Curated annotation (Swiss-Prot):
Zn(2+) binds at residues 641, 643, 665, 726. It holds the Pfam family Meth_synt_1. It comes from Klebsiella pneumoniae subsp. pneumoniae (strain ATCC 700721 / MGH 78578). Keywords: Amino-acid biosynthesis, Metal-binding, Methionine biosynthesis, Methyltransferase, Repeat, Transferase, Zinc. This is 5-methyltetrahydropteroyltriglutamate--homocysteine methyltransferase. Coiled coil: none annotated. Its EC number is 2.1.1.14. The gene is metE. GO terms for molecular function: 5-methyltetrahydropteroyltriglutamate-homocysteine S-methyltransferase activity; zinc ion binding. Catalyzes the transfer of a methyl group from 5-methyltetrahydrofolate to homocysteine resulting in methionine formation.
C-alpha cells in the first residue's frame, strides 16, 4: 500500500496579501466584482500549483473563502439572515459581505452577524443564525465551481466541506428558542445534493470536517453523528476530518460511522497511534496529521517517522498536516532578513508541504537519510544561547504567591481610585487604538525602510498622538487614550521590544475577512531590556488634565497571538512575559500614569478544547495576569479588555483576575453577555461595548441609550462604563467621530435622566 500525502487546506490571502487588497478595493468601490473574482481565481490556481510543485499528492479544494469558510457554508445552505437578504431572494457575493461586514457595494446595510473565534485559534468565523422552522436549499455553488476549476487544470483533488453536525454546533438560535440540532434532518438533503454533484464530477474522496468530534460533546450531539452519516454515505468516499485535539474520547462513536477514513491531529491530540489502528475498522484509511499546521517551526521528521512507521503496510495510510495550513504563513523563502540560523528552525506552509513529501518518501522507501538531514537544525536549536537566558529562568523560579496579589482588596482600591479621578456616572472611554490612517502607516513604513530618521519619526508620531488627544477632548470623553499611532499591531509592537521574540517580513496569516496579522515568534526566554510604552504615555498625559490610560497587551494574549516555542510549556512563556510587563506597569505608574489597561482578549480563546483540561490552563492564565498587574498601587486603576467572549463558564476566573474595570464586547450579542456577570454578581466595574467597531455603520444615540439601559438592568449604574466594543484602528475618522459623539451624548442623556 503506497502512502500518499495531502493538506487539509492552504492559506488564502496570497503571499503579498493580494486577497485583502482586492477585497478592500472592491468594498471601497475602486474595483469591479469581476476584478475581485479574477483575483480569487488567480490565487486558487497559484496555490494549487505551488502545493503540487512542493510534492503534495492530493490537493484541497473548497478551502478558499471570500470571508470565512463557515460563512461560505451558510451561503451554500441558503442560510442568510432576513436582514441581509436580497429583495429578489438571490444570493451573491455582496450577500456574503453584508453578513460579514454589515454592508457591501450593493444592498441595504444591516447589523453584521456575530463573529467569534474558530475553536482555540486566532482565526474567526461568522456565527450562523438559526430560526425555528428554518428551511435550507443549495443556494451558493462556490465549492462546485472551484472543483470544476481545479479539474479543468488537471489537478488530483479532494473537495473540503464543513460537516453538518459541526456547522449546527457552531451556530446560535435567534428569536424563539428551540434546539438547533432539530435542524439536522433539514440540512442533510443539501449535503446529499452536494455530494451527488461531486460524485457526478468523478470525485473519489471528500474531506468532511467535523472538528466538533474533538470536544466533550453533550450526548445528544454525539449521538447525532450516526443518523447524519447514515444519510450521507454511499455517493463518494468520506474522510471524516478532525483537528486541534485528539479523538480518543469519542472513538467508539466515530468507529461506528459509515465513512471510509478518519483524519486525526497527532500534533495537538494525545491519541495513541496503535490504539487508533486497533479500534478503527480495518478497511478504513487513516490520515495521520503529523505536520503542525498551526506553527512556523520545522518538524523533527525523524520523530514523526518513528511515530507512524509501525502502521506502514498494516492499513491504508496518508500523511497530512494536522489541520489546515491556513494558520501558517505561506512561504519562508521570501524571508530575506532572517538570520540564517534562526531561518533554519522554521517551515511555513509551502515548506510544510515539502515536509509531507519527505515524510511520505521515507515511509514508502524506508530510507531515512533525507529526513535525518532535514531534522538536524532542530537538535542544534535545543542548545542555542539564543533560546536560553539564565537570568529569566532564575527570576521565574523565584516567584512567590505574594507576587500575584494586589496590596488591598477591590473595595479599598475603588475608594482610592474614586478620590483620585472623580469621574462622573457613566464614564466614557475607548478601548485604546484610533484610526490607523494612510499617513500614520506611511510614517511607520518610511521609518522602517530607513527613509525617515528617528527624530522626524518621533515628531510625526507625537503630532498624531496630539491630534488624538484633541479629538477626544473635543468629543468630551472622560478617560482618554493616546491612540497607539506608533503601534502596527497590539502583539507585534510588544514583541518588537521584548527579547526572546523575532519577526518576519511576510509572515501574514488571516484573522477574519480581509484582516491579516503577522504574529511574532517566541524563539527564546522573554525579558524586557527597557521601557516600552512609558515615553508616549507620559507625553500624551502632558497634553491633558484628564486621565490617559497606559496601554499594554497582556501576557496570555501575547502568547496566544504569537507562534510559541515548542520546547517549553505555554505556562512558562506566559509567566516570562508577565514578569517583563510587570516592570512596565511599575514604570508607567512611576511616570504618573494612573490608569493602566492590560488587554487580555485572548484569555478565553486559549482554553483547551476539552473542558476537563480547563482548570489547569485558567489557573496559570489568571496567575500570569495578576503577576503582570499586582505591582500597581491601590489608587492605580487596572483595566482589562476582552472580546468575542462567552463568560458564563469561566466567570470565577474572570473575577479572579481582580481587574478594577473590565471592558467587554457585547453589542453584537445585544448585551446577552452581561447575564453572566449579573448571575455571578461580578463585584468590580464593567464597560459593556455599546457599538460594533467591526462594522462601518454609525450607531444612533437612541440605539446606544437602549443598550446602556439594558446594561443598567443587570449591573449597578455606579459600576458601569461606556465604551465601544473594541479598538478603532480599522475604522475611518469620520465614522469614528460620529459614533463616539453619539456614545458621549447617550451617556450625558442618561446622567441627566438619573
Amino acid at each position: 500500500m503506497t502512502i500518499i500525502n495531502h493538506t487539509l487546506g492552504f492559506p488564502r490571502v496570497g503571499l503579498r496579501r493580494e486577497l485583502k487588497k482586492a477585497q478592500e478595493s472592491y468594498w471601497a468601490g475602486n474595483a469591479t466584482r469581476e476584478e475581485l473574482l479574477a483575483v480569487g481565481r488567480e490565487l486558487r490556481a497559484r496555490h494549487w500549483e505551488q502545493q503540487k510543485q512542493a510534492g503534495v499528492d492530493l490537493l484541497p479544494v473548497g478551502d478558499f473563502a471570500w470571508y470565512d469558510h463557515v460563512l461560505t457554508t451558510s451561503l451554500l445552505l441558503g442560510n442568510v439572515p432576513a436582514r441581509h437578504q436580497n429583495k429578489d431572494g438571490s444570493i451573491d457575493i455582496d450577500t456574503l459581505f453584508r453578513i460579514g461586514r454589515g454592508r457591501a457595494p450593493t444592498g441595504e446595510p444591516a447589523a453584521a452577524a456575530e463573529m467569534t473565534k474558530w475553536f482555540n485559534t486566532n482565526y474567526h468565523y461568522m456565527v450562523p443564525e438559526f430560526v425555528k422552522g428554518q428551511q435550507f436549499k443549495l443556494s451558493w455553488t462556490q465549492l462546485l465551481d472551484e472543483v470544476d476549476e481545479a479539474l479543468a487544470l488537471g489537478h488530483k483533488i479532494k473537495p473540503v466541506l464543513l460537516g453538518p453536525v459541526t456547522y449546527l454546533w457552531l451556530g446560535k438560535v435567534k428569536g424563539e428558542p428551540f434546539d438547533r440540532l432539530t435542524l439536522l434532518n433539514t440540512i442533510l438533503p443539501v449535503y446529499q445534493q452536494v455530494l451527488a454533484e461531486l460524485a457526478k464530477r468523478g470525485i473519489d474522496w471528500v474531506q468532511i470536517d467535523e472538528p466538533a468530534l474533538v470536544l466533550e460533546l453533550p450526548p445528544a450531539w454525539l449521538e447525532a453523528f450516526q443518523p447524519a452519516y447514515d444519510a450521507l454515505q454511499g455517493q463518494v468516499k468520506l474522510l471524516l476530518t478532525t483537528y486541534f485535539e485528539g479523538v480518543s474520547d469519542n472513538l467508539a462513536t466515530i468507529a461506528a460511522l459509515p465513512v471510509q477514513g478518519l483524519h486525526v491531529d497527532l500534533v495537538h491530540g494525545k491519541d495513541d497511534v496503535a490504539e487508533l489502528h486497533n479500534r478503527l475498522p480495518a478497511d478504513w484509511l487513516l490520515s495521520a496529521g503529523l505536520i503542525n499546521g498551526r506553527n512556523v517551526w520545522r518538524a523533527d521528521l525523524t520523530e514523526k517517522y518513528a511515530q507512524i512507521k509501525d502502521l506502514v503496510g498494516k492499513r491504508e495510510l496518508w500523511v497530512a498536516s494536522s489541520c489546515s495550513l491556513l494558520h501558517s504563513p505561506i512561504d519562508l523563502s521570501v524571508e530575506t532578513r532572517l538570520d540564517a540560523e534562526v531561518k533554519s528552525w522554521f517551515a511555513f506552509a509551502l515548506q510544510k508541504c515539502g515536509e509531507l513529501a519527505l515524510l511520505r518518501d521515507a515511509l514508502n522507501s524506508g530510507d531515512t537519510a533525507a529526513i535525518t538531514e532535514w531534522s538536524a537544525p532542530i537538535q542544534a536549536r535545543r542548545h542555542s544561547t539564543r533560546v536560553h537566558n539564565a537570568e529569566v529562568e532564575k527570576r521565574l523560579a523565584a516567584i512567590t504567591a505574594q507576587d500575584s496579589q494586589r496590596a488591598s482588596p477591590y473595595e479599598v482600591r475603588a475608594q482610592a481610585q474614586r478620590q483620585r479621578f472623580n469621574l462622573p456616572k457613566w464614564p466614557t472611554t475607548t478601548i485604546g487604538s484610533f484610526p490607523q490612517t494612510t499617513e500614520i502607516r506611511g510614517l511607520r513604513l518610511d521609518f522602517k525602510k530607513g527613509n525617515l530618521d528617528a527624530s522626524h519619526y518621533r515628531t510625526g508620531i507625537a503630532e498624531h498622538i496630539k491630534q488624538a488627544i484633541v479629538e477626544q477632548e473635543r468629543l468630551g470623553l472622560d478617560v482618554l487614550v493616546h491612540g497607539e499611532a506608533e503601534r502596527n499591531d497590539m502583539v507585534e509592537y510588544f514583541g518588537e521590544h521584548l527579547d526572546g521574540f523575532i519577526f518576519t517580513q511576510n509572515g501574514w496569516v488571516q484573522s477574519y475577512g480581509s484582516r491579516c496579522v503577522k504574529p511574532p515568534v517566541v524563539i527564546g526566554d522573554v525579558s524586557r531590556p527597557q521601557a516600552i510604552t512609558v515615553d508616549w504615555a507620559k507625553y500624551a498625559q502632558s497634553l491633558t488634565a484628564k486621565p490617559v490610560k497606559g496601554m499594554l497587551t497582556g501576557p496570555v494574549t501575547i502568547l496566544c497571538w504569537s507562534f510559541p516555542r515548542e520546547d517549553v510549556s505555554r505556562e512558562t512563556i506566559a509567566k516570562q512575559i508577565a514578569l517583563a510587563l510587570r516592570d512596565e506597569v511599575a514604570d508607567l505608574e512611576a511616570a504618573g500614569i494612573g490608569i493602566i489597561q492590560i488587554d487580555e482578549p485572548a484569555l478565553r480563546e486559549g482554553l483547551p478544547l476539552k473542558r476537563s483540561d480547563w482548570d489547569a490552563y485558567l489557573q496559570w492564565g489568571v496567575e500570569a495576569f495578576r503577576l503582570n498587574a499586582a505591582v500597581a498601587k491601590d489608587d492605580t486603576q487596572i483595566h482589562t479588555h476582552m472580546c468575542y467572549c462567552e463568560f458564563n463558564d469561566i466567570m470565577d476566573s474572570i473575577a479572579a483576575l481582580d481587574a478594577d474595570v473590565i471592558t467587554i464586547e457585547t453589542s453584537r450579542s445585544d448585551m446577552e453577555l452581561l447575564e453572566s456577570f449579573e448571575a455571578f454578581e461580578y463585584p468590580n466595574e464593567i464597560g459593556p461595548g455599546v457599538y460594533d467597531i467591526h462594522s462601518p455603520n454609525v450607531p444612533s444615540v437612541e440605539w446606544i441609550e437602549a443598550l446602556l439601559k439594558k446594561a443598567a438592568q443587570r449591573i449597578p449604574v455606579e459600576r458601569l462604563w461606556v465604551n465601544p466594543d473594541c479598538g478603532l484602528k480599522t475604522r475611518g475618522w469620520p465614522e469614528t467621530r460620529a459614533a463616539l459623539a453619539n456614545m458621549v451624548q447617550a451617556a450625558r442623556n442618561l446622567r441627566q435622566s438619573a
